[in-house]
Amino acid sequence: EEEAKLAEAQRLIDEREAKPVKQVFKASGGIVDFVKHLATGKDTIHTKVISMEARAPDAEADIALQWTNGYSESIHSFANTINTHEGGMHEEGLKKALTNVINRYARNKGLLKEKEENLLGEDVREGLIAIASVRLREPQFEGQTKTKLGNTTMRSLVETTVNEHLMTWLEEHPGDAKRIVTKSSQAAKARLAAKQARDL
């Protein structure tokens, strides 16, 4: 499991090895370096990590995304450097925007046919490594371990940021965008095939 403190330096404890390894990611690279670390050894779909940020008067958000050809999703979220293991509003905003943007782009470019159903969130997030880090004045932590962010303003801030920036990135990187949509479509087909097999 990875724990990170996202302040001036990013500290990551990687416990996947027998002996935990501590790494420090300087603020200049920040969560992009963190995502690169998590993607080490994986077959990535696009070469550069997609990064975006939002700056509001009383809140900030930084997001980094890397799609891989893997089958599991790996989403990590933070609020004021606290690892929000249970997710929360910032993570909800990220997931909603990802699904919305990939579907809109796929429809606009004819990569999803009219008769085909929209891709689900799980399809779009297959193989995705993502980090959402937000900073705000009065965080509301919920859940059993107080690691779930309850501020609804963070959902809209992250959602708006990803909706805008990811769509722009896809438009500017059509080759990578097509590969991401193809990966998501393959995940959808596998999901539907598995459902049909269960229903037999």
What are these regions (language model features)?
Residues 1-200:
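GHKL-family ATPase ATP-binding module
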